[in-house]
Amino acid sequence: MLYDANYDRELVEERQMCKDICHEYNMVKPSDLERRREILRKLLGKTGKEFLIEQPFYCDYGYNIEIGENFYSNVNCVILDGAKVKFGNNVFVAPNCGFYTAGHPLDVKQRTAGLEYAKPITIGNNVWIGAQVCVMPGVTIGDNCVIGGGSVVTKDIPANSLAYGNPCRVIREI
């Protein structure tokens, strides 16, 4: 389903509010872990009790993001959460990773009109995502996976897989 993310007043206001909260979060002293968690608990749709997202962190709405217990994200995590983005328990995200639910139509008239779509992303339990990985709209990564650095994940990855590449593909079972 296509929607107008660029000119829909409500969505623009929600993204602006989220940007302000992300800015506030990114300006908190790194050593003030409790304040950082407090801000993220207000911003994100659901969090586990124990989690840490290193600064800087950016997202579009925040309320579409769910993180499980013992979630850790290193610096420069970007989550474009036009749809639900769910991370399981014990997920480790290395630096400079992006999770992109948003996509744009191939039709030039629709695209230039500002229309886009969003598809959910699901990351299972016990997953390690290497540095500079891009996870694209609609992808599910199963439990116990390792995604190698620099990968572009365009299709689902089954549980218990080592996968890497551009496009990302399963290398072997682990």
Residue positions per predicted region:
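Terminal amphipathic alpha-helical/low-complexity segments used for targeting or macromolecular assembly
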Residues: M1-E50, C168-I171
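Flexible, glycine/small-residue-enriched loop-and-beta-strand segment within the central core
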Residues: F57-I67, Y72-T140, N166-I174
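Short-chain dehydrogenase/reductase
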Residues: W128, V146, L162-Y164
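Beta-rich strand-turn-strand
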Residues: A131-D156
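Acidic, glycine-centered active-site loop in nucleotide-sugar glycosyltransferases
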Residues: I157-P167
